[in-house]
Amino acid sequence: MKKNSVISQEEKKGSAAFQVFGFTNKIRRLSAHLELHKKDYSSQRGLRKILGKRQRLLAYFSKKNRVRYKELINQLNIREIKR
């Protein structure tokens, strides 16, 4: 997935949308790695940490800009956070 298709020019590298996009890419890569290496516990821990970071960032983003949050989760094909 290309960053330019999800992130607009106004949103810089530090924006919440950009960070969520980066975490989502890392999560997908680690998930694919863990399908091959089921006993890689260090990577499992790293995946859980990244999932937590993304969840906190999505919670912040949903409070800040609900419309853009909905667009982002639809573009990235991820579920909404639980409330």
Swiss-Prot record:
Gene3D superfamilies per record: S15/NS1, RNA-binding
GO terms classed as biological process: translation
GO CC annotations on file: chloroplast; ribonucleoprotein complex; ribosome
Keywords, in A-Z order: Chloroplast, Plastid, Ribonucleoprotein, Ribosomal protein
SMART domains the UniProt entry points to: Ribosomal_S15 (SM01387)
UniProt cross-references to SUPFAM superfamilies, sorted A to Z: S15/NS1 RNA-binding domain
InterPro entries: Ribosomal_uS15, Ribosomal_uS15_bac-type, uS15_NS1_RNA-bd_sf
Main location: plastid
Pfam family of the protein (one): Ribosomal_S15
Annotated compartments: Plastid, Chloroplast
Subunit record text: Part of the 30S ribosomal subunit.
Name of the protein described by the UniProt record: Small ribosomal subunit protein uS15c
Organism encoding this protein: Fagopyrum esculentum subsp. ancestrale (Wild buckwheat)
